C-alpha cells in the first residue's frame, strides 16, 4: 500500500479505472456521486488525508447527510457507488479492506407514479392539445405503445416502418424490440414520413437533431410536463410514467371483460413487453390493475 495516496487522488484513480468497465450512463452517475463525497470530505478537511484514514464513521456521516437531504433510495444508490469504488481501491492495494462493504442498505419505500383517473387524463390531454402538441404526441407514444419515457427519447425516424406499422424500440441493454404501432397513433405520425432517418422524433423543436445524453432528454420532457402538472395542481406522485401505468391498467381491465385471467396475461405480455409472467403479475399488482368487485354483501 502507498501511504501517499490521498483521499482525493485515490478516488480519482478508482474512477478512472471504472470509466472503461461500466456504461457511460453508469459512469456519469459514479462521477456525480463521488464528486458529492469529495465535497463532503473537503468541507471537513479530510481531502488530503491518506485514503486509508477515511473511516466507516466518516462514510456513514456522509450517507446520513444524503438521507436527510434526499431519500432512502438515493442514500442506498450512493452507498452502492461508494462500495464499488472502495472495492476497486481494495483490489488495487490502496486500502487494506473495503470498509464500505460493512454498511447496510436501509429500507426504502418503492417510488411509483400513480395512475390517472379518466377525468385527470381528459384534462391533461385537453390542456396539451391546446398548449403543447409535441408533448401530447410524446405522451401518446408512452400511452399507446406502453413505452418508458427514456425509450421514447431514443426513437428516430428510421425506427418507424410506416408500411408495416412497426416500431423499433431500443432497450437499455441496446437490444431492439419490435412493437406494432396502433392505428390511432399511426395516423398521427404520417407527417414524419420522408424526414431525415437519423433525426430524433422528439427534440425541443419537434423532429430533428438532438445530440445530448438521453438522461438529459428525459429530464427535459419531465420538466416540460411539470408545467402541465402544475397548471392542473397534480402532485409529485404523478408523472410521465403514470401514463404507462394508466393505459396498461385500461387495457388489462378491458381484456378481462372478454378473457380469463390466464388468457389476458398471454395477450398483455405480447403488448407490454414483459418477458416473464411473474414480472407482469408483479407489475399489475404494483399498479393495482385488478380490483375486486363491491363486497358489501359479504360484510352484512
What are these regions (language model features)?
Residues 170-174, 272-300:
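Catalytic-site neighborhood detector that most strongly recognizes the C-terminal catalytic loop/helix
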Amino acid at each position: 500500500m502507498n501511504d501517499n495516496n490521498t483521499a482525493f487522488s485515490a478516488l480519482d484513480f478508482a474512477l478512472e479505472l471504472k470509466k472503461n468497465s461500466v456504461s457511460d450512463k453508469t459512469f456519469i452517475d459514479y462521477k456525480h456521486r463521488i464528486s458529492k463525497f469529495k465535497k463532503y470530505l473537503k468541507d471537513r478537511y479530510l481531502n488530503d488525508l491518506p485514503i486509508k484514514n477515511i473511516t466507516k464513521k466518516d462514510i456513514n456521516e456522509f450517507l446520513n447527510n444524503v438521507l436527510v437531504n434526499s431519500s432512502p433510495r438515493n442514500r442506498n444508490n450512493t452507498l452502492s457507488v461508494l462500495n464499488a469504488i472502495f472495492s476497486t481501491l481494495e483490489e488495487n492495494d490502496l486500502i487494506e479492506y473495503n470498509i464500505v462493504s460493512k454498511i447496510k442498505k436501509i429500507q426504502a419505500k418503492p417510488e411509483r407514479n400513480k395512475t390517472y383517473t379518466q377525468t385527470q387524463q381528459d384534462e391533461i390531454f385537453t390542456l396539451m392539445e391546446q398548449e403543447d402538441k409535441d408533448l401530447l404526441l410524446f405522451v401518446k407514444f408512452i400511452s399507446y405503445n406502453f413505452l418508458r419515457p427514456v425509450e421514447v427519447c431514443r426513437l428516430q425516424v428510421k425506427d418507424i416502418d410506416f408500411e408495416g406499422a412497426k416500431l423499433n424500440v431500443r432497450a437499455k441493454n441496446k437490444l431492439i424490440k419490435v412493437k406494432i404501432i396502433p392505428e390511432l397513433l399511426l395516423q398521427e405520425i404520417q407527417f414524419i414520413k420522408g424526414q431525415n432517418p437519423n433525426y430524433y422524433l422528439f427534440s425541443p423543436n419537434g423532429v430533428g437533431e438532438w445530440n445530448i445524453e438521453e438522461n438529459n432528454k428525459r429530464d427535459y420532457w419531465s420538466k416540460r410536463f411539470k408545467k402541465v402538472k402544475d397548471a392542473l395542481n397534480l402532485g409529485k406522485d404523478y408523472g410521465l410514467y403514470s401514463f404507462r401505468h394508466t393505459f396498461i391498467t385500461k387495457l388489462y381491465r378491458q381484456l378481462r371483460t372478454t378473457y380469463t385471467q390466464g388468457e389476458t396475461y398471454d395477450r398483455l405480455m405480447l403488448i407490454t413487453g414483459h418477458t416473464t409472467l411473474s414480472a407482469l403479475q408483479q407489475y399489475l399488482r404494483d399498479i393495482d390493475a385488478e380490483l375486486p368487485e363491491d363486497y358489501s354483501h359479504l360484510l352484512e
